[in-house]
């Protein structure tokens, strides 16, 4: 399955000057919501991701995603794996588990995002779950921006990667684009970064 073509065909690979949720600036932006608006394609992508995870023979009892961006990807992945799905969300800028969702002690959970950039949101989600007694066994995403080390990828983890090196990150593809700190972004000389994502900075 050609993941990059899926993003291009869905007009989900945007070019311009963007402020990413990680705080970095980039000339490209992946808008996974455009890919996931097609239920059939969302199902196919999740099945591809589930296949990778199943081949690793991990015991996964639940998938959890940080809202909002990860919810559709996480739900479809949970469906493909045949496990339950929950999500965390921000309340006063703090990641929280609400809506009656509960986790059992030592419940084995995979944290799923639509896109992993630095993994900061995924780690905030994981921390909430671990504080409630869950065991994080892996991370997953449709796309990886190439900062975090992906299972089955030749790319190494880069500076700024937040995910722990001892847990696997499953993703369908690496999308490696130039990213800049706002203080040294060359794009800022000619334009202002726009924020098309799902959360503020």
From Swiss-Prot:
Task: Tell me if Glycosyltransferase is a UniProt keyword of this record.
Answer: yes
Instruction: List UniProt keywords, sorted A-Z.
Output: Glycosyltransferase, Magnesium, Pyrimidine biosynthesis, Transferase
The protein's required cofactors: Mg(2+)
What Pfam families does its record include?
A: Pribosyltran
Enzyme Commission number(s) from the entry: 2.4.2.10
Give the reactions, separated by semicolons, that this protein catalyses: orotidine 5'-phosphate + diphosphate = orotate + 5-phospho-alpha-D-ribose 1-diphosphate
Q: Which family does it belong to?
A: Belongs to the purine/pyrimidine phosphoribosyltransferase family. PyrE subfamily.
Name assigned to this protein: Orotate phosphoribosyltransferase
Question: To which species is this protein native?
Answer: Helicobacter pylori (strain G27)
């Amino acid at each position: 399955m050609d993941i990059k073509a899926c993003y291009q065909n869905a007009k989900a690979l945007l070019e311009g000057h963007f402020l990413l949720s990680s705080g970095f600036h980039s000339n490209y932006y992946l808008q996974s919501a455009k890919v996931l608006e097609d239920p059939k394609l969302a199902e196919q992508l999740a099945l591809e991701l589930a296949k990778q995870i199943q081949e690793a023979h991990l015991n996964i009892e639940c998938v959890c995603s940080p809202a909002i961006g990860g919810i559709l990807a996480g739900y479809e992945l949970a469906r493909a794996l045949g496990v339950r799905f929950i999500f965390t969300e921000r309340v006063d800028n703090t990641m929280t588990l609400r809506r009656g969702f509960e986790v059992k002690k030592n419940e084995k959970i995979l944290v799923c995002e639509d896109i992993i950039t630095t993994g900061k949101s995924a780690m905030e989600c994981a921390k909430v779950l671990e504080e409630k007694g869950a065991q994080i066994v892996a991370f997953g995403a449709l796309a990886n921006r190439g900062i975090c080390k992906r299972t089955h990828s030749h790319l190494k983890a880069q500076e700024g990667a937040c995910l722990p090196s001892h847990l696997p990150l499953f993703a369908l593809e690496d999308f490696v684009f130039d990213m800049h700190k706002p203080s040294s972004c060359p794009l800022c000389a000619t334009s202002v970064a726009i924020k098309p994502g799902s959360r503020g900075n």
